[in-house]
Amino acid sequence: MDMAPDELDELRGSAQRALEQAIDFSFSCQQDDGHWVAPVSADATFTAQYVMFKHAIPALNLDISGAEAAALRHWLLGDQNAAEGSWGLAPGLPGNLSTTVEAYLALRLLGVPSSNPALQQARRFVLAHGGISRVRFFTRFFLATFGLFPWSAIPQMPAELILMPKWAPLNIYVLSSWARSTLIPILVVRHHEPLYPLPNAQSDPNSGFLDELWLDPTNKEVPFAPPLWDMFHGRDRDVVKLAFTLGDKALAQIGGLKKGPQRRLALRRCIEWLLEHQEETGDWAGFFPPMHGSVWALLLEGFSLEHDVVKRGLEALERLAVNDESGKWLQSTVSPCWDTALMVKALCDAGLGLGGAEAAKGNRHARVTTAVDWVRSLQLLGPQGDWRVYSRNQRPGGWSFEYNNTWYPDVDDTAVVVMMLVTHDPAAVESNAVEMGIEWILGMQNHDGGWGAFDTNNDALWLHKIPFSDMDSLVDPSTSDVTGRMLECFGMLLTHRKGGLRLRPELSQRLHESAQKALAFLFREQTASGAWWGRWGCNYNYGTTNVLRGLPAFCGDKEVARAALRAVLWLEKCQNKDGGWGETLLSYGHPDLAGKGPSTAAHTAWALDALLRFRPASDPALQKGVQWLVSNQVPKTEEKRHWASWPSDLYVGTGFPNVLYLGYPFYHHHFAISALARFLDRTDEPDQDRDLPLLMTRHVVTTLTRHDILLMVLGSRGDIDVFLSIAGKLAKNRHRVRVATHPAHQQLVEAHGFEFYDVGGGPDEFAQVLGREPNLLWSVIRGDLGRLRQSLCRTFARFWEAGYGSNNTRNARNADPKANGIADSRPFVADLIVSTPATTVHVHAAETLRAPLVLIAAQPTLPTREFPHVFTMNKPRYSPGSWWNYATFFFLELLNWLAMGSFVNKLRVHTYKMKPLCWVWATQDFLTAKIPLVCLWSSNVVPRPPEWHDEVMVAGSTTLAQVDQFTPPLSLLEFLNADMEKPTVVVSFGSMFIADPPALISAIASAAAQVRAKVVICRSWRWKLESSLASLPSHTYVADAIPHSWLLPRVDGFVHHGGAGHTAAGLRAGVPMLITPFFLDQHFWAAKVHNLGLGPEPLEIMMRAGTVAGIQTHQGKMQFAQSMQDLLSGQYSRRCAEMSERVRAETDGANVAADVIERELGSALARSGHCAVVPALPAQWQHAESGLALCGVAAASLVTSGMLDWDDLDAITRIDWIARRQKDPKSRLHAICFVADWLGHAFGMLLAVAGWLLQLVGDVRSVGRVKPHHNTDPIRLAMMERSMFDLNFAKQGLAEAELKGGAFEELLARRWRAAVAAAFERRMERTGNMLLGEGCQG
């Protein structure tokens, strides 16, 4: 709701006062020579390594009883996370194992005993996370220098790498600038393998120092790389990584090339390189690791501490140290050029540039000009620069990040400096400094159209397979955030008109050409949600806002406008309830957290500055964001502590994702100045946006762009749980989710807030029929499956109708209460279908809806030689590699088509007016079609077979979170806590049909009594057992549904039927499993669990037709008891725990599935485009004559006004399934099908003639081409109904605006006429050009 004029005036006044306070603080911390710089915070790694270095070199005088050591101790202990005793990568993040070990060692070197409570707490954290053997490479490397790791456990790093020519695939210049400058000195250190004394004067791996951090201190020879077999064949299979590891092992066998004649030459080249790259001030690359490593390498090569190079290097290292009230700590780098350029640009945005309204106050103008001159003087115009090695441009002109870094100018810094210069003085657009800076930026563009930070085309990602690369930071590829900054800079220069000054035409043309390549790169990088990933700032917020600031100058292009709109809507959706924006650094490892986190001034300012380029200042969301900045500004007395006018405690800068995060306090300051200044400028402008796009923002646009996603679920409770987990992820992105499934699941679906659609049938039907014959293949052959056909036909028809039909139950509730009315009343037409493979009609429904399809499988369904189709197994064993395995997939699909194909074709032809399909499509084309398939099981259990296509992802398992909602009965707790010396076993057979539950309970209780165990039996069958339960033995407990995630961690064994959900729960809990398979995929999972050593051999004595005859015999009872004894023997516990750890470390499969769904949906919407009349809305229709796309609102309005008829419009095709089938390669089977099809045509014609002659009316199947009937197409009718709804809803949303009566329709009609005229003008122009070309050829 818009603010009243007096409220807006009050907000403007508050924003102006906040801006003034921030400007005053800016000048209060300006340095004497005009520049700005604030300390750059990081984790404890750099301070800890500084302590190690000074301890290793006694001449550096680190006296543990002195003031310096006390200050270092004080800071390290103060940086510890008190809650868990760890040291993390940034405030608010969980502890990091490697950082904690480094801090622990540093404190021990500083004299803190291991008995210190802080170190005791740290020790517990380290051991809980696997111990010291699991630290990253560089931590292991530093530990080796003190003998705490044997050098033989450190990967080889041959110094000969420096000798590789620049054209070689592997040489120092294919590494990123930071990796190159860090690695070269480390090559020297690795050659020397130094061993420095510890406080107890020991440097022997067996000395016992730090043994308290090892799980097994007797074995420190722990390989860094995973086992070779895993890289060759296991879940970590990677040929490149395997080759590097084999090379490393081969080098180790021959002594790492140390004794070769080339080693001395290599070391000399390393030292020459270091000497060449040292700055006059002693710095190397302006970054702690190369500065620290270079001094270290020189000392090992015989340079004395008094040598000028070493002295200057040590002085540069000390300049990174900060002494404040928290103690002494080390910065990773310093950022004066970056800080100053951004600060000046912000101040100029606030009117302090030349001629600005604020510049005349006091001496502000002079102080800003001094800062500009200071930055300008840092332009790098000399011959240095590693960027020259591969850049096609050899002309210098960039700026670096730090005071002294002539070798590594920064693309990002250079663009900001150029914008700063032009913002301060419009005449600078024609200056040499700006032109040379732009020339240098153009020369640094990568072949993919984007920009990295320091190098060109530095994108050899395979380098991350090198054994010592565990931080994924060896290269500097193109990133969206840097590329967006370049476009912002280009856009400013291309639209610059102040004072009649502009860029040279030749340079402008080059900027345009470069920008087109950059835009193409950004289109490829945009995520399905509309956001962009941020490499150098946290994270999707930073990446997205950087790009958005670069797009306005190019939004004349429709593709740019669409990309911008998607990003704007995503950013608006991420706003927190308090009005601000924030994002946790955890989003780098968990993309589902993108845009989520506590509000910060930096994130809020980034969002506001970007959105104010697309939305008016009157937008309520933006005003709420400005109010957050105003309300959260710190008092003036607190500014110096924060180095900002807003809280700066949370880090928002990124060094290396998931490895190093940086705290730039000025980020929370100067970006907020720019945002407030832009808001105030926009409120001064006349509101020129009172046109349709902005009237339809927020409520209307958000509602009408909310996508309909249909989930088709056929199966048991375990199957529906998986889909509800996925539905929860989709609902968070504000999609409308409809779950079509059996009525047995209605209560569960609606309890989770999703719309339910009843398709009939139920899992009990399957269990009763298939329990008689476990092998589905034989069930089909024997005809047993015919009992299900009639029910399945009804169910499949309803699945199809669920994609467009009105809700057949009125109890559906939406998770978003604000959209509840719209979700219930807006006609549903699926924009995307998500289905289990078993629903059969999924691809046909997707074809009729012209919508993308994503399949979700809980068991393997694509052909492979690794195992047979799981539905054809009747024993828990199989032979890998058999041709029969591969054939079973096609054979089963053929039988399925023989059973259901005629019904499917009948629906296709008669109901949906589509062509029928041949059996070859079902048995070959569908199985080999590249339809996205997400496999929800762990790759540790079933790795991805090599035969499967690229669109198949083994995503990991998923669970439906229920623990927080579950309150266990008191009787259950008492049962579990009683007789603790007895092991407890859980027995659950899921949705299996049990004909005689009392007999089953009796058999289970008897077996448990024989092995002296307690047993919890989870029932799901419908049977009144109250009389039987009263006489249960004391060691038996029968319960209804209990969440596996709550119960399984509390027991010692798990007996179940082998369902995919039960198996995944057992794997996650790490509990040994005994599987008694009934039918279908249960035999497959039973075989897998046993083969992996996670439980005893499966029991094959269980039920047929739901009976328990197998275990009621004496032999059956004995076998059941023996298997249960084996289950509880403890021999499977270790393997189960290891598997649990691996499974838990995997990404939640539901997150992967949601990402795939978002990607497919985004791609489909991008193909359909946006409305030619209302660009804010996606297209649903296409005008046949002009080819113009229309949204539902525009189409319904034009039809209602009589300008168009519905027959003039075709539904937009988001995915062309017909064309997709035609692209599939043909086989001999297609030739057979063609002949059969031809004969069918002939036979059909004979039947038609006979029917006409005899005037017979029958169900004669048409096999020819079907012409669509617009008036009877149910999906088209549903789309028309939705379009009329959208029109009425949009008009209601505009009721309070100036467009009343027929003005809305009149505006749409005017836009339509203009769009049609423009379309025909373009067509005539193309026709004229073609005729002109033909005339010239004549």
Swiss-Prot record:
InterPro entries: EryCIII-like_C, Glycosyltransferase_28, GlycoTrans_28_N, Hopene-cyclase, Prenyltrans, SQ_cyclase_C, SQ_cyclase_N, Squalene_cyclase. Keywords: Isomerase, Repeat, Transferase. PFTB repeats lie at residues 19-61, 69-111, 267-307, 434-475, 515-556, 564-615. GO terms for molecular function: intramolecular transferase activity; sterol 3-beta-glucosyltransferase activity. Residues 1-687 are annotated as: Terpenne cyclase. The record marks W338, F401, W536 as: Transition state stabilizer. Its EC number is 5.4.99.-, 2.4.1.-. GO terms for cellular component: lipid droplet. It catalyses: (S)-2,3-epoxysqualene = isomotiol; isomotiol + UDP-alpha-D-glucose = 3-O-(beta-D-glucopyranosyl)-isomotiol + UDP + H(+); 2alpha-hydroxyisomotiol + UDP-alpha-D-glucose = 3-O-(beta-D-glucopyranosyl)-2alpha-hydroxyisomotiol + UDP + H(+). Pathway: Secondary metabolite biosynthesis; terpenoid biosynthesis. The keyword Isomerase applies. Pfam families: EryCIII-like_C (PF06722), Glyco_transf_28 (PF03033), Prenyltrans (PF00432), SQHop_cyclase_C (PF13243), SQHop_cyclase_N (PF13249). The active site is at D412. Residues 688-1338 are annotated as: Glycosyltransferase. Fuscoatroside and some of its derivatives show interesting antifungal activity against Candida albicans and Aspergillus niger. NCBIfam families: hopene_cyclase (TIGR01507), squalene_cyclas (TIGR01787). In the N-terminal section; belongs to the terpene cyclase/mutase family. In the C-terminal section; belongs to the glycosyltransferase 28 family. This is Terpene cyclase-glycosyl transferase fusion protein fsoA. It comes from Humicola fuscoatra.
